[in-house]
Amino acid sequence: MNKKSTLNIIDQSYFKKYIANIRPYGFKSLVLCIIDSVFSISAVYSSTIRTLDDFVEHACIKDKHKDEYTCEEFLNNYGDFSGEELANNVFKNRQRTSTVNGILKAQAVKEYIQTFFKNGINTTKDLLSLQDETPIKTQIQRIKGQGSGITFHYVMMLAGDSNRYKRDRQIDEFFQDILGYGKLTNDELTEAFHEQLRIVNEKYPEIDNIRGLDSIIWGYMSERTVRQKQIDKCK
């Protein structure tokens, strides 16, 4: 199967819309990065936004994108809460990390924050300043439901690392099926991302990082899924 170019698949309107609306990505608060990352896996993103907003209201955070809210603050305020209490009263979301023997995502968030804090990571700046992320990533992967490392990469993205992407079903479908790369390992997918970024960047210099391309692909695939559901409904 011949590989295709992202430029031949995604209409130019998606690229132009992204460029016109480039803005700061993610959150200043590491806690919010973790909440977004854990709750967004295998979930409709609108439910993740509601969960974030419920927490922001409960924690009295004024601006969820600009305000600092540290791991220490979370543990001071919610460290004694059980996973059940967090799920029911704070996040108002009882999703689990897996439908088979998964723990509450609320519990996973708490364990994530505890792991970061005991390793001296309190803010996004602390996380992005790590010289070697392997030890902390390994510890995070020991949390039930976090073994793949996907949420860790997404936390890094949300914290400000622009050379990350979030691997999910839509990204896999785009690269493996639509572009024709076939089944890819994590390293191979990263290489494919960089290959497509070079192609896109030649035409759109403003799009110069993996995170930006990930956002464009995600937007395209989300709308494609909606259109397909509408077509299926009319059959």
Describe the predicted segments one by one.
Residues 1-101:
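Structure-specific DNA junction-binding interface
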Residues 64-68, 74-80, 116-122, 162-167:
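Short, exposed beta-strand "edge-strand" segments with a Pro/Gly-rich flavor and a Y/T-containing core
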Residues 1-28, 102-114, 121-235:
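C-terminal accessory module of base-excision DNA glycosylases/AP lyases that mediates lesion recognition
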Residues 39-47, 60, 117, 163, ...:
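Short alpha-helix boundary/capping elements
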